[in-house]
Amino acid sequence: MRSRVAVRACHKVCRCLLSGFGGRVDAGQPELLTERSSPKGGHVKSHAELEGNGEHPEAPGSGEGSEALLEICQRRHFLSGSKQQLSRDSLLSGCHPGFGPLGVELRKNLAAEWWTSVVVFREQVFPVDALHHKPGPLLPGDSAFRLVSAETLREILQDKELSKEQLVAFLENVLKTSGKLRENLLHGALEHYVNCLDLVNKRLPYGLAQIGVCFHPVFDTKQIRNGVKSIGEKTEASLVWFTPPRTSNQWLDFWLRHRLQWWRKFAMSPSNFSSSDCQDEEGRKGNKLYYNFPWGKELIETLWNLGDHELLHMYPGNVSKLHGRDGRKNVVPCVLSVNGDLDRGMLAYLYDSFQLTENSFTRKKNLHRKVLKLHPCLAPIKVALDVGRGPTLELRQVCQGLFNELLENGISVWPGYLETMQSSLEQLYSKYDEMSILFTVLVTETTLENGLIHLRSRDTTMKEMMHISKLKDFLIKYISSAKNV
């Protein structure tokens, strides 16, 4: 039988471990634990640590404009959850209910543009994939969350025959054998390095790209000192570039220019994206890219020249298998990590695109037109189809044919013609402006007579007549032109 001292000690150990739980323990369900110790030995710092994820100091309020934007993002389904669940800190840390249908589409478009820019139109960059979680050794300072069966944990904690030392040993063994959730995409790419080196005939430089969800602890120092409040999620876009040491700094400069230019390309106010030099505790150089939100700058992407340390740490022993060709020389490459947060990037573009302008539909000067002027390549929906005056059945059939034609050509469409509730044109345009829909097409009885449709622009609010046969080519040319700017 354990003494009271041992019982109190065991409870203390359990409280320390359980402070890393991501939720309530239910029978048979995986729970999440995190180890938080002082770094020792050969532990390689994760990019979550290098970037300082999980901590967002309070900043001054962002004003009425931010509240209006948040309300639109909820009402138009860019974001899910209540106002209380969508605080600034929760959005920045990835601890919110998630994105709505339009938010998912916006992030998908942003990811597609990143992929096109970094992978599709670039030589020697290859896609890779890695597991979200896998077993791994329990290292000092390892802060990764681990998946643990609640039933296994409950059996250990309820065994009253265990001494304090046995209880601690059992819990540590559970952590060692459990799978840990990935905090970044870097190590998944490094695992592919040797195999992909053969793919390029050992010629440097080359890169490995991946987009995926990563997890990080979010700390609540107000309630529990060094305690974990919840698990943050973010969608990362990662390029790991393997380059000869002699050209590593030039490549870092190249990727910095490329990434900053890319972020600015889709912005209404490009100057809100900026960069700064940085250096980690080991003296490794890098750059950080920021977006200037109403409350201040927030990190959206990091670039690091990590040297050869990560590769040598992952592949100890035979260094020759790491050698790539730099001309006639065999060298261990430097690792450049280019790591962007697409969720924060999406939030940045929502703030960048939000505009309050005078409402041309009303004489009341205190009422403003609220519009999200997202870049044409990023806008979740390109065109809305609605019906005006005329025989409803015939007009809907025309809209359905147009809907299918546009979808077949990769143009996303909102089927407003299916709506049964009557709305004025003012209400329709306001709704579609808030959804960031580029164009509204109105099919009327005139369309049945001579093929002419009404086309209204989100950005200019101008309306024009166009023949229905020209709409597809017009939209394709418009989006293509915006992509090439």
Curated annotation (Swiss-Prot):
Start and end residues of each stretch annotated as Disordered: 28-65
Entry's Gene Ontology molecular function annotations: DNA polymerase binding; DNA polymerase processivity factor activity; DNA-directed DNA polymerase activity; double-stranded DNA binding; identical protein binding
GO CC annotations, alphabetized: cytoplasm; gamma DNA polymerase complex; mitochondrial matrix; mitochondrial nucleoid; mitochondrion
Biological process according to GO: DNA-templated DNA replication; in utero embryonic development; mitochondrial DNA replication; positive regulation of DNA-directed DNA polymerase activity
Keywords of the record: Disease variant, DNA replication, DNA-binding, Mitochondrion, Mitochondrion nucleoid, Phosphoprotein, Primary mitochondrial disease, Progressive external ophthalmoplegia, Transit peptide
InterPro entries reported in the protein's UniProt record: aa-tRNA-synth_II/BPL/LPL, Anticodon-bd, Anticodon-bd_dom_sf, Gly-tRNA_synthase/POLG2, POLG2_C
Name recorded for this polypeptide: DNA polymerase subunit gamma-2
Source organism: Homo sapiens (Human)
Positions with biased composition (Basic and acidic residues): 46-58
Known function: Accessory subunit of DNA polymerase gamma solely responsible for replication of mitochondrial DNA (mtDNA). Acts as an allosteric regulator of the holoenzyme activities. Enhances the polymerase activity and the processivity of POLG by increasing its interactions with the DNA template. Suppresses POLG exonucleolytic proofreading especially toward homopolymeric templates bearing mismatched termini. Binds to single-stranded DNA.
Subcellular location: Mitochondrion; Mitochondrion matrix, Mitochondrion nucleoid
Result of changing R182W: In MTDPS16; decreased function in mitochondrial DNA replication; decreased protein stability; no effect on DNA binding
Major localization class: mitochondrion
Disease: Progressive external ophthalmoplegia with mitochondrial DNA deletions, autosomal dominant, 4: A disorder characterized by progressive weakness of ocular muscles and levator muscle of the upper eyelid. In a minority of cases, it is associated with skeletal myopathy, which predominantly involves axial or proximal muscles and which causes abnormal fatigability and even permanent muscle weakness. Ragged-red fibers and atrophy are found on muscle biopsy. A large proportion of chronic ophthalmoplegias are associated with other symptoms, leading to a multisystemic pattern of this disease.
Keyword rRNA-binding: no
Annotated gene: POLG2
Assembly notes: Heterotrimer composed of a catalytic subunit and a homodimer of accessory subunits (POLG:POLG2).
Superkingdom of origin organism: Eukaryota
Modified residues (Phosphoserine): S38
